[in-house]
Amino acid sequence: MVKYISILGSTGSIGTSALDVVSAHPEHFKIVGLTANYNIELLEQQIKTFQPRIVSVATKELADTLRTRISTNTKITYGTDGLIAVATHPNSNLVLSSVVGVSGLLPTIEALKAKKDIAIANKETLVAAGHIVTELAKQNGCRLIPVDSEHSAIFQCLNGENNKEIDKLIVTASGGAFRDKTREEMKTLQAKDALKHPNWLMGAKLTIDSATLMNKGFEVMEARWLFDIPYEKIDVMIHKESIIHSLVEFIDGSVIAQLGAPDMRMPIQYAFHYPTRLPSSYEKLNLLEIGSLHFEKPDLEKFPCLQYAYECGKIGGTTPAVLNAANEIANALFLKNEIAFFDIEKTIYKTVEAHHNVKDPSLDAILEADQWARQYANQLLIKKS
């Protein structure tokens, strides 16, 4: 069966890897829609290669510019409405959500309402509104297929298993770019230092989140919703080699793990062709060459953002959306070298502390909390500077 795919975020790290997968298996995958933010040069190349029916960019000006460069019949849209138009296009049956941040929330919700299966790589959508997204998927008979390597690993480990027999999920973490630094050394580190991820090729925002371990915190929150498992049964383990992508421990003491080379094309391909597998030419795992694997507990005093994520997830309501929004603001300013590395965790903590939580929130309440948190975090950092 051919999968007709729309990719939200086609010019990013996940999006370009996904298009590599499509190129490797043109008999199985066809592109219906693509979206980019500002990188219209790369999007132009993608349009010429994959001939999508519809694309979307950030602004009307970019859309107008793109129209002058494209001679195909591809429809060109823009903004949030454009994202939603791509996500809900009637010709697609699978949507890869790989845009960065909470901007993926509305198009994902609309895609589910349009009864599309979602290959989900945008973890912030589940962090901010996991209860809404998972319920919509159930109501509309849609599958949420994880793309993050850790969640894909758990998804594969649970294939054919009974969720009631799970004792715990163990999410692995590389530890990020600063894993071997002390708190004292981390004080003066800049964005260029954090962007040197030891194992994975990722976008800038995600690489900074990896350095703070906030990314791992978001993955814990995502796992809670994807697999309907309480936070008390989700552990994080530092595994510097990034060979074991995650593990599941069952009530009888058995542990199932998923291993593979650190290449995002593998979980993307698995999500695209689920429930069956396709052959690939990607690097095969050779444990004899690797020789040994190492594991350790995360240091929550050194990386408090992971602890914040657990605490905010357990509180629930609008607090996770506030956590995410404050992180997005601080992360972006750190990337511009406008704040110090530790200002990220301080901003998140102060913003969450100031928030008045709303339990069982509507989508509007979540979006309102998101906007409040962005404004509050910005004000904190303006006062600091």
UniProtKB/Swiss-Prot annotation:
Reaction equations catalysed: 2-C-methyl-D-erythritol 4-phosphate + NADP(+) = 1-deoxy-D-xylulose 5-phosphate + NADPH + H(+)
Assigned keywords, A-Z: Isoprene biosynthesis, Manganese, Metal-binding, NADP, Oxidoreductase
GO molecular function: 1-deoxy-D-xylulose-5-phosphate reductoisomerase activity; manganese ion binding; NADPH binding
Keyword rRNA-binding: no
The enzyme's E.C. designation: 1.1.1.267
Annotated binding of NADPH, by residue: 11-14, 39, 122, 124, 203
Cofactors (names): Mg(2+); Mn(2+)
The protein's annotated pathway: Isoprenoid biosynthesis; isopentenyl diphosphate biosynthesis via DXP pathway; isopentenyl diphosphate from 1-deoxy-D-xylulose 5-phosphate: step 1/6
Binding site for 1-deoxy-D-xylulose 5-phosphate: 123, 149-150, 174, 197, 210, 215-216, 219
Protein name (database record): 1-deoxy-D-xylulose 5-phosphate reductoisomerase 1
Organism, as annotated: Bacillus thuringiensis subsp. konkukian (strain 97-27)
